[in-house]
């Protein structure tokens, strides 16, 4: 049996119009009778009244009543809609605590909902991820997890592994039992390979969709005065970098974040790369090379008819295995008959960069955000990758001649990882760690 908990669910901004205080537990209706002047409402009803401390009125409120177990938390819950601000909210909290509740830990309402069987960990984490979404695409991806299709997919994998494990154990412990399928190599290997294929596809889709949650680093490199800082400013639509006609103006890396089609990028405007005897400028050039190594996308900015030198070749060499985009700047100064169709031309100073933006996004298109097999949550993705590794180890073991009683260890590990994605109520340490990252009142 849980105790009674309370928290502000709407945050605690100083000047917000409304504050929502949530209570949950076995005695919350009785607590409300002590401090609320209105009627105790029926399930899913709203009543009007005042919150009082002894006979002193604290606030005029609307109270929403939710009888357990048919609500989010799965137990009696009350939500008080009070006037906003820290002072009034704090007074109401103190009054509730004085009458038999305690302050909730972060995520404790969601944790109770999980323990009461109202949601699994996939949906619980989707709620938290939705709250912390930074882009529209992130929010769309997270809300899709509410329909439980991802959970159903994981549970289907779990059930297939349960069948394999159960059959293996019967074959090991009761080899004389005739009513169960004999798991020979010819039977077990295809089943595991089918599972490997399913999980591999989920991991592949998940890795691709991570672009909407990770920051993709882009290094803008090239010679001095080719327009790198102007390009950074054009992409950001603001003046972040200093732009002059003096070569070597940028001597350190200037970083800025921007979102393009819902994808987060980290732009890095680097020092111009050339031969220099200036000690400070040489340090900046070395940093430019380092940024090429550390970035996923390299925008190599050049001018028309620019000859390739040793530094240009080094940029290309360091860009091997990365997305390399060669861009010709100052398009407005080039006659139309000299523009080639297979090249990307821009005018950074005039903000004419649409062709470059298309090139940046090219490899990140055609991702189906509705695919329920996609897993973006870091904890869940690590677990499904671990389960895939264990299944691959089991397959490898069988192909090397090991018997089912040996590889069942790897198969069981794969099952445990998948079970921990949707959640196990007996793993208290996991639950405490996960729900502690939630907001107060959630």
From Swiss-Prot:
TrmE-type G domain sequence ranges: 215-365
PROSITE patterns assigned to the protein according to its UniProt record, in alphabetical order: G_TRME (PS51709)
EC number of this enzyme: 3.6.-.-
Record keywords, A-Z: Cytoplasm, GTP-binding, Hydrolase, Magnesium, Metal-binding, Nucleotide-binding, Potassium, tRNA processing
GO BP terms in the entry: tRNA methylation; tRNA wobble uridine modification
Cofactor binding description: Binds 1 potassium ion per subunit.
Domain of life: Bacteria
Enzyme class: hydrolase
Keyword Repressor: no
Residues that bind GTP: 225-230, 244-250, 269-272
Molecular function terms from GO: GTP binding; GTPase activity; metal ion binding
Binding site for K(+): 225, 244, 246, 249
One GO CC annotation: cytosol
First-listed, main subcellular location of the protein, grouped into a coarse class: cytoplasm
NCBIfam families from the UniProt entry: mnmE_trmE_thdF, small_GTP
Record-stated family: Belongs to the TRAFAC class TrmE-Era-EngA-EngB-Septin-like GTPase superfamily. TrmE GTPase family.
PANTHER family listed in its UniProt record: TRNA MODIFICATION GTPASE GTPBP3 (PTHR42714), TRNA MODIFICATION GTPASE GTPBP3, MITOCHONDRIAL (PTHR42714:SF2)
Protein name per its UniProtKB record: tRNA modification GTPase MnmE
């Amino acid at each position: 049996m849980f105790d009674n908990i309370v928290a502000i669910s709407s945050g605690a901004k100083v000047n917000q119009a409304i504050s929502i205080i949530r209570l949950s537990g076995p005695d919350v209706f009785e607590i409300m009778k002590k401090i609320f002047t209105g009627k105790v409402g029926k399930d899913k009803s709203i009543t009007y009244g005042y919150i009082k401390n002894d006979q002193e009125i604290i606030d005029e409120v609307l109270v929403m009543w939710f009888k357990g177990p048919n609500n989010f938390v799965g137990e009696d819950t009350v939500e008080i809609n009070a006037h906003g601000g820290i002072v009034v909210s704090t007074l109401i909290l103190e009054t509730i605590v004085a009458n038999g509740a305690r302050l909730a830990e972060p995520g404790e309402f969601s944790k109770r909902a999980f323990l009461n069987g109202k949601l699994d960990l996939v949906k619980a984490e989707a709620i938290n991820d939705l709250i912390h979404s930074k882009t529209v695409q992130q929010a769309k991806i997270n809300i899709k997890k509410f329909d439980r299709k991802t959970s159903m997919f994981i549970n289907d994998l779990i059930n297939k592994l349960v069948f394999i494990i159960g059959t293996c154990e019967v074959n090991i412990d009761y080899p004389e039992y005739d009513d169960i399928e004999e798991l020979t190599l010819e039977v077990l290997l295809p089943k595991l390979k089918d599972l490997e294929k399913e999980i591999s596809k989920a991991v592949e889709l998940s890795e691709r969709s991570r672009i909407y949650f990770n920051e993709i680093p882009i290094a803008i490199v090239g010679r001095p005065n080719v327009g790198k800082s102007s390009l950074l400013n054009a992409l950001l639509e603001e003046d972040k970098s200093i732009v002059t006609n003096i070569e070597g103006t940028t001597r350190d890396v200037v970083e800025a974040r921007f979102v393009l089609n819902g994808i987060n990028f980290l732009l890095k405007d680097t020092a111009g790369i050339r031969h220099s005897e200036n000690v400070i400028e040489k340090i900046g050039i070395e940093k430019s090379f380092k940024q090429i190594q550390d970035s996923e996308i390299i925008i190599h900015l050049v001018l028309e008819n620019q000859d390739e030198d040793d530094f240009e070749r080094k940029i290309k060499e360091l860009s091997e295995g990365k997305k390399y985009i060669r861009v010709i700047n100052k398009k407005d100064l080039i006659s139309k008959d000299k523009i080639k169709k297979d090249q990307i031309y821009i005018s950074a100073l005039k903000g004419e960069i649409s062709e470059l933006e298309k090139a940046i996004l090219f490899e990140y298109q055609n991702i189906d955000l509705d695919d329920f097999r996609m897993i973006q949550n870091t904890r869940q993705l690590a677990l499904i990758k671990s389960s895939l590794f264990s299944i691959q180890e089991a397959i490898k073991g069988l192909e090397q001649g090991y018997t089912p009683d040996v590889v069942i260890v790897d198969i069981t590990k794969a099952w445990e990882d998948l079970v921990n994605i949707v959640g196990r109520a007996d793993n208290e340490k996991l639950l405490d760690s996960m729900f502690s990252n939630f907001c107060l009142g959630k």
